[in-house]
Amino acid sequence: MPALFLALLTSALAMVGGRPALLTARLSGHLGGNVGLIAVCWLTAIVTSALAGWGGAWLASQMAPAAKSMFVAAALAVSSLELLLMRSSNAPAEPTRSLGAVALVLLAEQVVDAARFFVLALSVATGAPALATAGGALGSGAVLSAAWSLGGVWEARLPLKPIRLGVSGLFLIAAVIVALSARGVIG
């Protein structure tokens, strides 16, 4: 169960200030809360989390136990860096009404984001890819649902940059602690 809860929390934290949530909010504001959009959000969250979980299951069989903890530390550090350096894109001038196009964009955004990297790392570290996948999908889907429901006011109601920077700092501190623990410096 730790894999499920850790994946849920880290995925949700990583998604709050992320591009997929921002894009979802902007599209929802423009399209008027289209129900198809929320279905696409959940579908892409599930598919990308499943891909990350599958990749983690494969990697777990290839790694030594000590390397698994360092992989989690690396995931935390890279995710921290991604959130720190992320620039929000401009709102689409003429967003498409095609749910297929929206699905492709959300899929591309999510397949390489911090939340999926956490699902991958937690699948490797815990040996529970199904639980990590479920947690990642639930955490990501919940944030995308919130972005969808708030629509155009997502950016106005949430201080996204301070949230993103705060979460980045938390992930960096966690990366240092996990790395020191994996190396046996702290116990």
Segments predicted by a language model, with ranges:
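Small-residue-enriched transmembrane helix starts and helix-helix packing motifs
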Residues: 1-16, 84-111, 134, 138
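Juxtamembrane transmembrane-helix termini in multi-pass membrane transport proteins
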Residues: 2-57, 118-137
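Membrane helix-loop-helix hairpins that form the core translocation module of multi-pass transporters
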Residues: 32-88, 146-155
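Small-residue-rich segments of transmembrane alpha-helices in multi-pass membrane proteins
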Residues: 44-48, 99-111, 165-177
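Interfacial loop-to-helix junctions that mark the boundaries of transmembrane helices
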Residues: 58-69, 127-136, 158-166, 187
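Transmembrane helix exit motif
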Residues: 73-95, 174-187
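Hydrophobic alpha-helical transmembrane segments in multi-pass integral membrane proteins
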Residues: 108-121, 172-187
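Interfacial loop-to-transmembrane junctions
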Residues: 149-172
